[in-house]
Amino acid sequence: MFDLSADPAEIGARLGRDSLLSKRLEAMPGLRVPGCWDGFELSVRALLGQQISVTAATTLAGRLVRKFGTQISTERTLTHLFPSPAGLAEADISSIGLTRARGESIRALAGAVAAGQINFASVVNLAEFQSRLCELPGIGNWTAQYIAMRALGDPDAFPAGDLGLLRAASFRNERDLARWAERWRPWRAYAALYLWQASGDPDENPRPAATQRPAGKHSTAVA
């Protein structure tokens, strides 16, 4: 969850040699990549947040949980548990204000998790897992890389098509940034975090630089 096993000295020694990152590491040494409590919830929130602000994505997540989650009673402010994969697989998710296509993407992910086709708890091969994710409608390389970074703790995950990364690194396209980022292996996730920190807008989600690809097709910049 808190990436406590990371070695900031080792990571900094590698990334600090790069002209794009050296000053950022000096200003903010020791950044760690935050994880999550639940891979499915993180993945749904990643889909909810595509192409919109943090504020808007948080609003949608709240609607989703209130409408489809399990209501509970606590002494504090927690009122609902996040919806189960089986529950979301059958839900009319577009009713919370999503486009039908985005709702179907979440339903497809939920169905795959409910059926055991996607299992965040037993990932052996990260590349194969990301490939299975990308077979689902509405999920492309950006989303798969972001999930690998935040839900699976992959230190080398890198969503090169992310708009904030492209802006912070002053690259015009995903291909050129991906080529430059090869020198950051095996710590590209940390490089992404430093670039996001430099993007400067606290209300801007990590997001793809172009519209989400249609299911089964790839584009030069995908979500």
Regions found by a protein language model. Name each.
Residues 1-223:
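HhH-family (HhH-GPD) DNA N-glycosylase catalytic core used in base-excision repair
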